[in-house]
Each structure stands twice: as C-alpha cells, then as structure tokens.
Amino acid sequence: MENTQNKLNFLSWEEAKNKAKTFLKDFTIKEKIRLMYGSAMNPGNRCVGQIEPIKSGIFKPEKFAGIKFCDGPTGPRFQKGLTNSWPTPINLASTFNRKLIYEVGKSQGNEFYHVGVNVALTPCINMFRVPTGGRNFENFGENPFLTGELASELIKGIQSNGVIACAKHFIGNEQEKYRCASNSIIDERTLMELYAEPFYKAIKKGDVGCIMCSYNAVNGVYLFKNKLMNDVLKDKFKFNGFIISDWFAVYDDSPDSINNGLDINMPGTKSKIPIVGDLWFNPSLWSKVPKYVEDGLIAEEKINDTAERIISTMYKFSQIDYFPKKEFYSQSYITENTKKLNRKAAAESNILLKNEDNILPIDLKKIEQENKKYKIAILGIDAVKGEFYGQEPNFINFIIPIKSVDGHIANGYGSGTTTFKYIVDPYEGILNKVQNYKNIELIQYAKLDKEDNEDIETSVEKSKDCDLVLIFVQSISGEGYMKIGNSFGDRKDLSLLHNGEKLIEKVSDVNKNIVVIINAPGPVNMDWRNKVKGIIFGGLAGQESGNGIADILFGEVNPSGHLPFVIGKREQYPADIKDIQEYDILSTNLSSSEALEFKDVVNYDEGLFIGQYWFDKKNEIPIYHFGYGLSYTKFVFSDLKCNFNKELKQLEAKFKIKNIGNYEGGVVAFLYLTFPLEDEKYPIRVLKGFDKYFLNINEIKECSIIVEEHDLSYYDVDSKNYIMPNKGYYTVYIGQSSDIKDLTLTEKINIE
C-alpha cells in the first residue's frame, strides 16, 4: 500500500487561510454558496455524501475538486469488505492507551485516504449518560476528560494521513429516542464542563478540522440553527475548521442556520435511498441564500467566512494540492499489519472483571503435562458466527429489517458500522489455540429455539462433566432506525439476549468452573456474577474479536483493559431513557413544521453527576467501578510526590509502580483531584489524568502525570470562562481505578 504521508504537505492554519483567500479570489458568490451544501446521499457510490466539483466552464478544468464524506467510527463504511472492521470506540477507550489509539486512527486514516474520502465522520464524542443509550458503543465512555484525551489521539492519527476528521455530535445527543425531535435541557455549567469538554479537547489537542452538529435541540433551539455553534465552538474555543449538519438535520429554510454558524448542510439534496425517499429534505434554503444575501439577511462576509473555512481546512491537510481520486473498488486494504494491529487492540480492550481461584489463564502446557483429558465446554450463540457479517445483504449496517442476532457480536448497528470482510469468532480463536494439544477436548454447543432463546437443557447436559465451561453471552444496540433483539436503537433494558441469564444460572447448578464472556455495548444485568468464577467484558471488538478473546483466555496477552463506564443496576443510574418503544424515526424528521415540534424533552437534571460521579455523590456501591480491571499479575504504587508550577500553572504528580506478580503486564494509573471548592454541585473527585504503563516481572517504573491549567480549572458561569481557584488545596489521588479503596496514594498540594 502506498505510504500516504510521503506526498502530504501540512500547513499551519495561518498559511492555509492565506492560501484559501487566494484560491477563492475568482469564485462568484453563487460558487461560494455551492460549497455550502451537498449533492447526494448514495451508498452505491460508497460514500455517504459529497459536495460536487465546481467547473470553470464547459471543457475547462475544475475550479474545485469536491469533497467526499464517509462514516465512521469503526472504519470506512460501505466498502464491500475492502477495508478493516476495527474495535468499536468503547473498546478503544477500554485500553486507556493513547499510543495504541493513535496507531488505530493512523491506520483508519490511511484507508479513508486511499479510497478517496476527504472527511471521515468520526469520532463520536457524546457522553455515556445513560446505560441503555443506543450509540454508547460509538463513544469513549462516561467521562469527559477520558473522551477528550482519547478522541484527540484518534483524530491526530486519522489527520496524519491528510484526511479530515469530523467530531460529532454537537451537542446533547445522548439517546436515540426521538433524537430528531427532542429538546435537551442543559444548564450552562453542565453543558460547558461536561458535554462541550470533549469538543474543546478535540479542537485544542486534536486540531480537528470538522465538527458535526446533532439532530436534537438544546434549551429550545435545534442545533442546526443554535448559536452555540458560533458562541462556543468558533468564538470561545477558536475552532478554525467547518461545521456540518448531521444528515437531513436542517429542518427549515430560514437564514438562521448560516448566521448561527452552520457551514455545510448535508447531504443537501434528495436521498437516493428508497426507504428515505422525499423525507428529510428541504431544498428551498439553498435556492433562497442568494436572495438572503442580496436582502442583507445573511452578510456576504458570512458566506466568505464559510468558504474560507472549508478551503483552508482542505489546504491545511494537503487536500487541494494532492488528493487521490475516489477508488472504492481498487483493492483490499486489509493487510497482515492491519490484522495484527486490529488483534492487538481487540485483546487489549478485553476487561477481566473476575478471576476467582485464578481460573484464568488456561495453562495449556500444564494440561498437557498432566497427560489426561481436559474438557472445555463452549456455550452460547455468541461464540460462533451468525448471518450478519460479510457481503450485502447480510451485514449490520444500514436500514435492513432484522429480527435478532444469531451469532457473535463484534459491532453495533447503524451508520457507525462497517461491512465485515471476515470475522474471527471466539470458537475459531479458541480452536486455533488448542488444535495441536491432544489432551484438550472442545465441546461446542449453541442453538436457538423458536422463541429465540438458547437451548438451555442441552447446554446443561453438555457441561456437566467438563473441567471448564466458557459461556458467551451478548447484548446489542445501535442507531435508532431499526429494531434488533431488545433494542430499538436504545436498549429497552440491560438484559442479555436469548435468555442468557438463565443459561448461566442453570449451567452453574451443575458446574462451578465457569467463565462468562460478555459481548455488549455497555452494562448488562449481572445478578448471576457470584455463581461463576470468571468474567470478561469483551465489548464489541471488531473483526479480530475472537482472536483477542482467545489471547486473553490462554494468557498470551495479559488483560489490561479497564472499564470506561461504571457498571451498576439500572435503577442506580441518575438518568434513564423512559418508555423506549418502537417508533418510526423517519417520521420524526420531516422537512416540515412537524419536525420542529418536540416529541420529547430530556432534562439533564443530574448536572455534572453522571456515571461514577453520581455513585460517589450518593455513596452508592456499584457492581464494578469506573476504571476497574484485573490483571494476571499484581502492581504496587508508591512514593507519590506532587509539585505545582505557579509559572506554568501545572501540577505534576510523580510516583512509582512495581510489578510484583508472575506475569509481565500493563496497568493504568488514574489521577483524580478534589478541587478546593465548597460546592455541592461539583463532583467529589474528578478524573484529570491517566496513563498506561507496561512492566516486566519485578520491574519498577518511575512515572509522571502532568495536569495542565485547563484541567485544573472549572467553568464559572458568571465570568463565562474556565478559571482556576486562586487559593486552597487540591487533593491528589493516584490508583488503579476510581474506587477510593484503589486510590492508594494521596497528597494535598497548596496552589497559592
């Protein structure tokens, strides 16, 4: 594969803006307006939207080559299996590994680049506000600091290949239910410090080139015309790139959208998808813009600013001078190197939640030395391939009616998915490990009955005399335009599909040596957890999912994943999506006055207290804390020393980690702060630093985490700015999860 970066010439924003002014010098006002809306949504062309080229005239060269947009968070969409299907962002977040996520972004960017995509519609940086949220798997978890840090690495990786990343969905889009006709009520402090924070980091650390606004309204105004685009992104955060609408999210033809910060309306023209047809399209806006400019309702300077933003962003990422033509069918971009990286990310994202009696890892050499038969039962439909992965029509991707899931889940569904060229299921991954060991006998069984439930009776019989039972269970969610299993986008509940809870409980009656592997987009019911010895949360880990799980089970990879969300019972969470029901999402997004009528009001009354912060505030004990994750080895933290640099306004925490166990492995160090604030509306401890360290047996590492001024600040509503407290003590906590029992190092430091 051609090395993308050899031909790229990246510019500073200032250089790019100067070039854009020169480039646009001969453009008419109508040609500049033509940059501001798309021309089609046609998956048959392998991109989800585009801005058409602008020609100088008949038989004359193009003045502008156009822009092609493509989803998404797990790799290029609609590529007929030519590109990789990567672990979902929630899995990437579980690694807490900035370097790894940068490499995944870099590899994804290379794929987007070589198929001719200018703008990759990724990453999603909404918050894991409710445990049942349909698109939780497309995001990086419940914490704004974590999300901003990791999303910035993915952005930098993608954009290192000259592909513009698009951070989405700005803002307050944490559920699928009536997402196109809902009104999120969010107070200013919560909006700025929690939900806007990942966008701040995407801009300041990731230097993201594009941001997408969401379908919903915030505080009574739909985002496509909400002044938050100007006030927050462009003015306060100094965003230099361009803002696009979500697809079909411009509901009226007033000048408000352009005046309040929207730069591009997507997809801009009638959809070519039959099920969508004439819905969601209001073409009259763009025919009216020239008249709006003529009448002074839209300033010509606004049109110029938008055009310059679009062209300067393309210059910055070397897309004007050199960019390949669309080559969607040219070749496969699945290589041995991408498979290796994919597998590494999948394995590192697995989270070991329980390991009673050291039931894991499975020691194949020891079993062979004992020279007796060792029987492993592999139960559950999630252990084997189903009908969904591969070429059309059998893939979870777009608007395809599917009753349920009948095999291993490695992705959610909707626009954040890909077409799988292949998938390694867990049974295949396990078989590859044991096939050369004559004493290992695998007993695999999975069958769904007419009610779509596991055949529990047979599963129990097959597991009775086994030395080890591996039970694979699942749940799924996705974008809210179709129903699968227990979800219509958002999950109706936290139950496992196919009566998975009953399968675990019945098998546990006849065999105690059970390891449960969960493939799901987020928390599930775990009332059965005390009946098994081992639990792994595998998330939705992409095409190498089965190999990644097998690497953990057999100890080839020491688990180092940590939860990017808290796991509790549904009633313990501060927010929920009530009355999830089957509704036609298309009918809530018509280009008419009906679309402007709110069908749901979502009150963010919990303020800053989502996820673990809520559990801390209420002294609730979760099932598993944010950041929890076990290893096959043990680590000890010691010797914390903190220093505050008044000149740089930085806090540095130095400490040591020692691996005192019998395996080499990785561990995440979390830095939490208690702010010098007497404010009951502020969390008790906030995550403001983390890093991942890999240590050999008996190795000691000297570690350092630096907290910058912005992360030492809070949002002050009166001054409408981020400010540091001017006196008092921060309390610094260092440890292996958010649980106060794991935060073993602590020190107070004076900032005066």
Mark where each language-model region is:
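Intrinsically disordered, low-complexity regulatory regions in eukaryotic proteins
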Residues: T744-E752
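Glycoside hydrolase catalytic-domain context in secreted enzymes
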Residues: M1-I740, E752
